[in-house]
């Protein structure tokens, strides 16, 4: 069995702070599509917690709000080509 080259890479940098906790926002509103758009990729996918820097509670609420906004046709399911 051949050995793998390279070791485990470590992530460096500052830990991101949850935007909602920082601004004391308690409710993630599905109608605020400008805010929700910040947490989706250019392809329309929901970004991961390690990318957005949200806490677990607000990541769940944001994902739920994005899904509701998609149902109401405020956000696209996928981005146009």
Swiss-Prot record:
Keywords: Ribonucleoprotein, Ribosomal protein, RNA-binding, rRNA-binding. Coiled coil: none annotated. One of its GO terms (biological process) is translation. SUPFAM superfamilies: Ribosomal protein S18. GO terms for cellular component: cytosolic small ribosomal subunit. Signal peptide: none annotated. GO terms for molecular function: small ribosomal subunit rRNA binding; structural constituent of ribosome. The keyword ATP-binding does not apply. Transmembrane segments: none annotated. It comes from the Bacteria. Belongs to the bacterial ribosomal protein bS18 family. Part of the 30S ribosomal subunit. Forms a tight heterodimer with protein bS6. HAMAP family: Ribosomal_bS18 (MF_00270). PANTHER family: 30S RIBOSOMAL PROTEIN S18, SMALL RIBOSOMAL SUBUNIT PROTEIN BS18M. Binds as a heterodimer with protein bS6 to the central domain of the 16S rRNA, where it helps stabilize the platform of the 30S subunit. This is Small ribosomal subunit protein bS18. It comes from Rubrobacter xylanophilus (strain DSM 9941 / JCM 11954 / NBRC 16129 / PRD-1).
């Amino acid at each position: 069995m051949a050995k793998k080259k390279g070791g485990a890479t470590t992530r460096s940098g500052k830990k991101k702070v949850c935007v909602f906790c920082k601004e004391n926002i308690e409710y993630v509103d599905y109608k605020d599509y400008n805010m929700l758009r910040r947490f989706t990729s250019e392809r329309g996918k929901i970004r991961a917690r390690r990318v957005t820097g949200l806490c677990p509670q607000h990541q769940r609420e944001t994902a739920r709000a994005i899904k509701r906004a998609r149902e109401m046709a405020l956000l696209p399911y996928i981005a146009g080509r």
